[in-house]
Amino acid sequence: MSDLHNESIFITGGGSGLGLALVERFIEEGAQVATLELSAAKVASLRQRFGEHILAVEGNVTCYADYQRALDQILTRSGKLDCFIGNAGIWDHNASLVNTPAETLETGFHELFNVNVLGYLLGAKACAPALIASEGSMIFTLSNAAWYPGGGGPLYTASKHAATGLIRQLAYELAPKVRVNGVGPCGMASDLRGPQALGQSETSIMQSLTPEKIAAILPLQFFPQPADFTGPYVMLASRRNNRALSGVMINADAGLAIRGIRHVAAGLDL
């Protein structure tokens, strides 16, 4: 029997990409899975596909009331919460400082940080009491942009660096009751979109990066699928396999950190 059998897992952004892969994996592990998903169509698809195995709630991660509404349903269904996975996010399609108009940069910043940072903070706030009671865990999705430049523009990169600080602070504040960790995947097959303020809400990451381009920069030389990254989340959520880790961020970068030096700077053609 899996360590996660009957564990109550709450995942944001479970309708596509990595979030959907996490929903699938935790259901396979025997967990009671719930998700907060912005898209009504994706909520309907989740319910049709997984039936009674999923509690799919339509809502916005930038709205505390939506978190609370989802959590109330989770506690009614399961009586507890064992792990919160903050995963919903948006990307900036490498929108650069120089080429982005100031007004757009400002509005894009607020929209992106509201989702990528405030969304995590509000989720942590809503879930903390239940996780303290269960002595559970939080896991937040980062990115290779939490460690390296060039995985996005300044908006996205700054948001993921901010999330690392949030993980450390929450791990400190919630110890010893709640373990708080992060997983930073590299580029993958995903429907990740951008901010509406940047005109990117209908543009997915795969329209900016081809599978060949992603595979070419990775020392492991393959194009990752979302399911390739679910293992670290399962390990971190497991009470038996992760009693000792908190404030830890797993850099699941397919070897990016071991690359040799190729480019001195990204602005040589300015």
From Swiss-Prot:
It comes from the Bacteria. The active site is at residue 156. One of its GO terms (biological process) is 3-phenylpropionate catabolic process. Keywords: Aromatic hydrocarbons catabolism, NAD, Oxidoreductase. NAD(+) binds at residues 10-34. Pathway: Aromatic compound metabolism; 3-phenylpropanoate degradation. The keyword Chaperone does not apply. Substrate binds at residue 143. Its EC number is 1.3.1.87. It is an enzyme of class 1 (oxidoreductase). It catalyses: 3-(cis-5,6-dihydroxycyclohexa-1,3-dien-1-yl)propanoate + NAD(+) = 3-(2,3-dihydroxyphenyl)propanoate + NADH + H(+); (2E)-3-(cis-5,6-dihydroxycyclohexa-1,3-dien-1-yl)prop-2-enoate + NAD(+) = (2E)-3-(2,3-dihydroxyphenyl)prop-2-enoate + NADH + H(+). Belongs to the short-chain dehydrogenases/reductases (SDR) family. Converts 3-phenylpropionate-dihydrodiol (PP-dihydrodiol) and cinnamic acid-dihydrodiol (CI-dihydrodiol) into 3-(2,3-dihydroxylphenyl)propanoic acid (DHPP) and 2,3-dihydroxicinnamic acid (DHCI), respectively. This is 3-phenylpropionate-dihydrodiol/cinnamic acid-dihydrodiol dehydrogenase. It comes from Escherichia coli (strain SMS-3-5 / SECEC).
